[in-house]
């Protein structure tokens, strides 16, 4: 675990096929991609650690990250439907995508602190 989780995630996510696989797991199975990336970064761990992490992050992931993602996805078809305002709607969607990314980055920061604390227990 030498690289930060964020750096590790960017490198792994950029590999061929990883992004599409992660997004498929997210869309089809409801997988939290950050949890998946954490598991790859962290390596072997006890079930209790993963359960504790999911319990800690569940409200943030469901309420904030997924909430922003849902809003971003809802706006996408509206860009065409609101053609007279399509540029403004597209800009708003882009801002929400940026907030979603920041929320994921914060989630990963929490995960890194969690891993550091768990490793010392």
Residue ranges and their predicted role:
Residues 1-15, 66-73:
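An acidic intrinsically disordered interaction segment
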Residues 5-27, 91:
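Short amphipathic alpha-helical segments and their helix-coil junctions
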Residues 8, 21, 37, 53, ...:
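A general alpha-helix detector
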Residues 19, 61, 65-68, 72, ...:
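A structural signal for well-ordered alpha-helices, especially hydrophobic packing surfaces
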Residues 20-58:
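N-terminal interaction modules that seed assembly of large macromolecular complexes
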Residues 42, 72-75, 115:
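Hydrophobic residues within well-ordered, non-membrane alpha-helices that form the packing/core
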Residues 57-85:
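Helix-adjacent hinge/juxtasegments
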Residues 77-121:
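A charged, amphipathic interaction segment
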């Amino acid at each position: 675990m030498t690289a930060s989780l964020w750096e590790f995630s960017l490198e792994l996510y950029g590999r061929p096929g990883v992004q599409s696989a992660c997004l498929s797991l997210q869309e089809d199975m409801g997988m939290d991609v950050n949890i998946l990336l954490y598991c790859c970064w962290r390596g072997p761990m006890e079930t209790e650690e993963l359960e504790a992490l999911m319990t800690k992050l569940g409200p943030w992931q469901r309420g904030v990250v997924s909430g922003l993602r849902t809003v971003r996805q809802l706006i996408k078809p509206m860009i065409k439907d609101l053609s007279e305002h399509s540029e403004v709607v597209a800009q708003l969607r882009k801002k929400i995508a940026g907030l979603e990314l920041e929320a994921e980055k914060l989630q990963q920061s929490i995960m890194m602190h969690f891993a550091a604390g768990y490793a010392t227990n």
